[in-house]
Structures are given as structure tokens and as C-alpha cells.
Swiss-Prot record:
It is a single-pass membrane protein. One of its GO terms (biological process) is catabolic process. Gene3D superfamilies: alpha/beta hydrolase. GO terms for molecular function: cis-stilbene-oxide hydrolase activity. This is Juvenile hormone epoxide hydrolase 2. InterPro entries: AB_hydrolase_fold (IPR029058), Epox_hydrolase-like (IPR000639), Epoxide_hydro_N (IPR010497), Epoxide_hydrolase (IPR016292). One of its GO terms (cellular component) is endoplasmic reticulum membrane. Belongs to the peptidase S33 family. It is an enzyme of class 3 (hydrolase).
Length: 465
């Protein structure tokens, strides 16, 4: 081999090595200020008390809603089209009629007020949360856990799972004390007055909330945007987060995407026989993503424009939100005239969530999380490439919008203790399959406890040497 060839091969090897390093290198934990002021004007002294709060919507708001629901015109759907073009207006008419004539907000309001609600000011924003303290005997351990919702959800998604997580069981010696916040700009939580409040900055607010309540160490759980927020909490505050459970474990790195491409050569080996269809063929999943992500592009670029229409029209708001509850639960439901919405949910349950957006006028501010979290400033934090050492568990529901193998997730989550392939369910797990989700949370937290116990024992042994 000539010297030129040797030099060329050496250059190629070095180049590939540098490329591999750049693609796979881990980033340091970013320095996110803990006291950024997100309220109006300049930072000022705040009331740090935790104020009891009760949902009590003005009659005028409800009367206006009824008037608007009585004056809706519907464009007929195309022949042979179900939910493929979005929310079928024949189904929407039935929903609006139910909303106007049968849905009773005052009854639902009383149900929502069943658990104690509070507000407290964090970094200039009044943050709303529900706080559930279980009543148990002394031999049952009570573990604090924050559960964070996403879009287009709200804290009401968790109401079914509350008793499952707070009631003592014979197979575990612990239950959970739950903190269910509304993300800033959602529902009864105040929206930021300044740009820049992305998922990572919200994670700081949620950590400060837990600290304000009195929890120095706690567990986290989330799906959708909640999954991104609690993942960031685990990454930024490993000394405080005891365990991280998510029903949407996801990362979007160049190296993980390359693995998906290379894995297409050996799909069953890469994904496992039962999970191949969740990733491959790549082209099919790409076009599905393209078809279903139109809302994402709007909300990541011009959320305030579409927000004007959605805030003004309750029927439009319901269609926009509940179309996601159909497709997000099972994308095959696009081929059903009613979107199969009532096969897993009731109209009442679905409208409870829509009402949180309507009565608070928060649809515009809720959508801004997309623009803030996909800004260049936020993306430059490279949170997906900052390692998370906190014990982690992933519940993988079969109809979730995205799927990553444990091999890919291990890039970020260095202590992945549990990964469960669920038998059924989709994106809105807490509302759709609360029992499955609760079982997985209990199982995961038991593993987290055992992990910390072994770690503490090992540290003690090292100290004794």
C-alpha cells in the first residue's frame, strides 16, 4: 500500500472517529437560573404563601357559553370521510348538542373541587396545583410525587388515577402524596408575561413548587409535555428527584435517529419482533408524522394567531382539542365517523378538559410552550444529550405517538430500571388506562426504592473500609 493510501485511510479513520465523538458526546448540565422572573414588569417581593383556591366560574361565563353553543354553523363533511380531515362535523354537532343541553358544569365543578386546590407565586407567576394527602396508618409510607400533564390535557386527566395511587394496597407498603400542577399558561396557572418559558424553564418552576410545599426529595411522573418537563427536572435536580416515571420516554438526537436508520437493516433485532411495527417501515411512520403534525408547526411558530379563533369559538376549541384525543388514543380511529371517542371516554369527561381551557381562556397561552421549547435558545440547551442519572422507568403504550427502544433511550437515561410494553392504550394514559398506569408506577417506584437502598448500603460499606 502506498503512503498516499495509508494517509488517506488514516484520515478517514480519524474523521470517522471525530464524527462519532461529535454525534455521541454528552453535554454538561446547563446553568438554568432558579429565580428568573416570568411575571409582568421587574422582579419584586412576592407572597410565598400557599393559598387555598376553589374553582368557581362566574354565571356570566357559562351563560355566554350557552349562547355561543346555540349559534354554531357546521360545514358538512365530505362523503366517505370520517376523521381523516379532522373532527367530523356530524359528530361535532352531537357533541355541541350534548354540551348545550346535558352537560352540567356546576356538577363537574363540585367534582373537581373534591380535592384541595391551591395557588402560590413562583418566580412571578401564580401556579395552581391540586394537593392530595392520603389518610393511612403509620406502617404505610407516604411518598411525594408530582404528576405533570401536557397539551391538550390538564390536571383533570389525573382524577381517575388519584384513588389508585393514594389508597393502601396489600402488595406495597407505600402510597403517594400527589401534587398535580397546572403548567404555567394552562388552566388556572398564570401565563408568562415574557418570552422564553420553555419546558426546561418550567421544570425549574415545578422544582421550586415542590420545594415551596416542603418536599426536598420527591418522585416525578409525566406524559406529553409533562414528560419533557419531569425529564428536565430529573436532569437538572438529580439530588432531589428520587425517581422518574414517564409514559412518553423520548429523545430526538442525531445518534438515536441514525440507530433507527441502521436498525431498518435488521428491524426485528433492533426493535424486537413485537415492536417492529412501531418504528418500521420508516417511510410510513414519517408520512404519518407529517400528516398528524400540522398543529405542531402552527403552535411552534404562530400560536397567537390560531389562538384568537379557538378562544372565541367553544365549538372550534372542542374540535381542535378532541380531535387529538381521538387520533392520539389510536391513529386508526381516523377511519371512524365518531372518531371512536366514546369507546374509551365519555362526552362528559372530554368536556371537563375542554372546559378548563374555555373558562380560563388559556388556549393561546397553553400553545406557546411549543414556540418557546422549539426556539433556538431552548434547543441550544441540548437537553436530550445531557445525561440523566436519576432512576427511570418508561411505560410504553402501544398506540403512543412515538416509540424509542431501550437501546436508544439509554443514551440519555443512564439508570433505566424498568421498561414496560403495555398491552393497550395510547397517548392519554392517565385518562384512558389509569389502572395500567398506576400499576406501572407502583412497580417502578419499588425498583427506585430498592436501587437507592442498594446504593446506600454500598456507600456505607465503602465508608466502613
Amino acid at each position: 500500500m502506498s503512503n498516499c493510501c495509508r494517509i488517506l485511510w488514516i484520515a478517514i479513520v480519524i474523521g470517522l472517529g471525530v464524527l462519532y465523538y461529535e454525534i455521541t458526546k454528552e453535554f454538561p448540565k446547563p446553568n438554568i437560573p432558579l429565580d428568573t422572573w416570568w411575571g409582568t414588569g421587574k422582579s419584586q417581593k412576592i407572597d410565598t404563601s400557599m393559598r387555598p383556591f376553589k374553582i368557581a366560574i362566574n354565571d356570566e361565563v357559562l351563560n355566554t357559553l350557552k349562547v355561543k353553543l346555540s349559534d354554531v354553523s357546521f360545514t358538512p363533511p365530505l362523503e366517505g370521510i370520517d376523521f381523516q380531515y379532522g373532527f367530523n362535523t356530524n359528530t361535532l354537532k352531537k357533541l355541541v348538542d350534548f354540551w348545550r343541553t346535558q352537560y352540567n358544569w356546576r356538577e363537574r365543578e363540585a367534582l373537581l373541587n373534591k380535592y384541595p386546590h391551591f395557588k402560590t407565586n413562583i418566580q412571578g407567576l401564580d401556579i395552581h396545583y391540586v394537593h392530595i394527602k392520603p389518610q393511612v396508618s403509620k406502617n404505610i409510607h407516604v411518598l411525594p410525587m408530582i404528576m405533570v400533564h401536557g397539551w391538550p390535557g390538564s390536571f383533570v386527566e389525573f382524577y381517575k388515577i388519584i384513588p389508585m395511587l393514594t389508597t393502601p394496597r396489600t402488595d406495597y407498603n407505600f402510597v403517594f402524596e400527589l401534587i398535580l400542577p397546572s403548567i404555567p399558561g394552562y388552566g388556572f396557572s398564570q401565563a408568562a408575561a415574557k418570552p422564553g418559558l420553555g419546558a426546561t424553564q418550567i421544570a425549574v418552576i415545578m422544582h421550586n413548587l415542590m420545594d415551596r410545599i416542603g418536599f426536598k426529595k420527591y418522585y416525578v411522573q409525566g406524559g406529553d409535555w409533562g414528560s419533557r418537563i419531569v425529564s428536565a427536572m430529573s436532569t437538572l435536580f438529580p439530588e432531589n428527584v428520587l425517581g422518574h416515571h414517564s409514559n412518553l420516554c423520548f429523545l430526538n438526537t442525531l445518534s438515536s435517529n441514525i440507530k433507527s436508520f441502521v436498525g431498518s437493516l435488521f428491524p426485528e433485532w433492533f426493535a424486537g419482533k413485537q415492536n417492529v411495527h412501531k418504528i418500521y417501515p420508516l417511510s410510513e411512520h414519517f408520512f404519518t408524522l407529517l400528516e398528524e403534525s400540522g398543529y405542531f408547526h402552527i403552535q411552534a411558530t404562530k400560536p397567537d394567531t390560531v389562538g384568537v379563533a379557538l378562544r372565541d369559538s367553544p365549538a372550534g376549541l372542542a374540535a381542535y382539542i378532541l380531535e387529538k384525543f381521538s387520533t392520539g388514543t389510536n391513529k386508526a380511529w381516523r377511519s371512524a365517523k365518531d372518531g371512536n371517542l366514546q369507546s374509551k371516554f365519555t362526552f362528559t369527561e372530554l368536556l371537563d378538559n375542554v372546559m378548563i381551557y374555555y373558562v380560563t381562556g388559556s388556549i393561546t397561552t397553553s400553545m406557546r410552550i411549543y414556540a418557546e421549547s422549539y426556539s433556538w435558545d431552548h434547543l441550544s440547551l441540548n437537553m436530550d444529550r445531557v445525561p440523566t442519572i436519576v432512576p427511570t422507568a418508561c411505560a410504553k403504550f402501544p398506540h403512543e405517538i412515538a416509540y424509542k427502544t431501550d437501546f436508544q433511550l439509554a443514551e440519555k437515561y443512564k439508570t433505566l430500571l424498568q421498561s414496560t410494553i403495555m398491552p393497550r392504550g395510547g397517548h392519554f394514559a392517565a385518562l384512558e388506562e389509569p389502572l395500567l398506569l398506576a400499576e406501572d408506577i407502583f412497580s417502578a417506584v419499588k425498583k427506585f426504592i430498592d436501587h437507592h437502598s442498594k446504593k446506600d448500603s454500598k456507600n456505607q460499606e465503602n465508608r466502613d473500609l
